[in-house]
Amino acid sequence: MFRAHWLYLSFGLAFVISCSPGDETPAPSATPEDVHAESWRESRMLAGQKIYEDVCASCHASGEEGAPILGDRAAWSGRSDLWTAVLAEHATAGYFDMPEKGGHGELTDDEVTAAMEYILLKTFPEKPRD
């Protein structure tokens, strides 16, 4: 009888423990701002990719005129730590043999900057983005 009592008590305790909620916390859900920010980044990278392919790749895919090649870390690594600002200025205003806006004056400064951000993302994917 004493053994049966402990057996029932053990099963009951195991049942109660298995049914308790424990320390589970729900996974944090994305806020609307997070979703919007991620969607904006993706849209910007797609726009930058298109501009790169339409304009920049004519030199930066082959290294024409000494242009650093997309993805060639060594070619891009000697650049300033102020990547975004310096490269945006070079891409917008022209730099050495690279013409202003890659020779496409119809591009906005923001479009040129999006292409430059795409180049940096593809060359240095581990670097944090603004």
Protein language model features and the residues they cover:
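Sec-dependent bacterial lipoprotein signal peptides
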Residues: M1-I17
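Axial heme c-ligation environment in periplasmic c-type cytochrome domains
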Residues: I69, H90-D130
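Electrostatic cytochrome c docking/interface patches
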Residues: T25-K50, E65-D72
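Extracytoplasmic/secreted proteins, especially bacterial periplasmic and envelope-associated proteins
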Residues: A47, I51, A75, V86, ...
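The canonical Cys-X-X-Cys-His
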Residues: Y52-S62, A115, I119
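Gly/Gly-Pro-rich "capping" loops immediately C-terminal to redox-active cysteine motifs
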Residues: S58-E89
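Mobile acidic interaction elements
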Residues: H36-R41, A57, A61, W83, ...
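Bacterial signal peptide processing site
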Residues: C19-D23
